[in-house]
Amino acid sequence: MTLDGIDKALLIWGPMPDEALSYIRSVGWLVIVPEGRPFMTGLKQNAQKLKKAGIKFVYVNDNTLGILFNKGKIFRTIIFYKEKNDTGIIGFCGTMYVTILSRLHNVKIELFAAQALQLAGSVDLLGGKKYILKDNVRDFIVEASDEAVSFKELQ
């Protein structure tokens, strides 16, 4: 699919619970499924669920989100968070990135509790092949971690 083929889209971020499928279906827009590195939650969890449910989606790499926002393709963002507290949420790696892009482009953010991250086997493998750098260079990689996002930042 090309950018011209995307009219109005819903971005989902974080591991989507099954209960969210009916809501996403009711919105009726194309769903943008980012890869969700480093755990590939978009490809390994969300895309599979959407496909099984018959919901139309496109899979994109995380870096493409800036272009989609800039071109006015994303009209709503759903963030599936790990934890909610008095000051905000704890989201998966990249939650702040998606929050900033959504706010910058005046896109409404909705919050839903996430499904537990399902890591079947090594997260270094995709289709049985390594996609993360060799172990001997891990000292040069900034490890992903959960991100705290305040309610102020989410508005």
What do these predicted ranges mean?
Residues 1-56:
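N-terminal active-site beta-alpha-beta segment that forms phosphate/nucleotide-binding
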Residues 41-155:
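Conserved phosphate- and dinucleotide-binding cores of soluble alpha/beta proteins
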